[in-house]
């Protein structure tokens, strides 16, 4: 895997401190949310823990600067508002982060189903997330928990039905 390319802001010490001026803070949060999504996609991760203070995402060792838990929460809050994250616990310490929104994932999967003529067939989540027929698509490699959440949205719209089989999930598309 190629080395992650950090944006120039990552080497700018004030970037690691929540800015007091509203416009500056909004721009800072925009850059951080983009950085979170790009970094997590690059590292193929879908979960974050606020307590993981040694992660390069939270800590620039060369600058000896680290994000405060408050700033991490502010960034994750922005990601939540844009549909790219949800807390996994009530204390909001563990988060699931989506490279695309759940609706975007659902639409990508449904488009693939339509294009490949798989309506009225049953697919496993593994086939969708990791199968050789999807290896060229943006949702390839998606965490199955994220995929399941996206498929639940499709199910609410009447586009599919989730089926549980021996503790694993399948899905029938309409």
UniProtKB/Swiss-Prot annotation:
Keywords in alphabetical order: Cytoplasm, Endosome, Membrane, Protein transport, Transport
Top-level taxon of origin: Eukaryota
Subcellular location: Cytoplasm; Endosome membrane
Protein name per UniProt: Vacuolar protein-sorting-associated protein 25
Gene field: Vps25
Coiled coil: none
Effect of a null allele: Vps25 mutant cells exhibit multivesicular body sorting defects, with large amounts of ubiquitinated proteins detected on endosomes. This leads to activation of signals (through Notch and Dpp receptors) that drive cell proliferation, non-autonomous overgrowth, loss of epithelial organization, and render cells sensitive to apoptosis. Vps25 mutant cells display accumulation of autophagosomes. Bicoid mRNA is mislocalized in developing eggs.
One term of GO molecular function: structural molecule activity
Pfam families: ESCRT-II
One of the protein's GO biological processes: protein transport to vacuole involved in ubiquitin-dependent protein catabolic process via the multivesicular body sorting pathway
Family to which the UniProt record says this protein belongs: Belongs to the VPS25 family.
Record InterPro entries: ESCRT-II_cplx_Vps25-sub, ESCRT-II_cplx_Vps25-sub_N, WH-like_DNA-bd_sf, WH_DNA-bd_sf
Keyword hit for Metal-binding: no
Functional note: Component of the ESCRT-II complex (endosomal sorting complex required for transport II), which is required for multivesicular body (MVB) formation and sorting of endosomal cargo proteins into MVBs. The MVB pathway mediates delivery of transmembrane proteins into the lumen of the lysosome for degradation. The ESCRT-II complex is probably involved in the recruitment of the ESCRT-III complex. Seems to function as a tumor suppressor by regulating Notch trafficking, hence preventing non-autonomous overproliferation. May be involved in the regulation of autophagy.
Lineage, top ranks: Eukaryota, Metazoa, Ecdysozoa, Arthropoda, Hexapoda
Assembly description: Component of the endosomal sorting complex required for transport II (ESCRT-II). Interacts with Lsn/Snf8/Vps22.
Organism: Drosophila melanogaster
Annotated Gene Ontology cellular component terms: ESCRT II complex
Record keyword Membrane present: yes
Principal cellular location given in the protein's record: cytoplasm
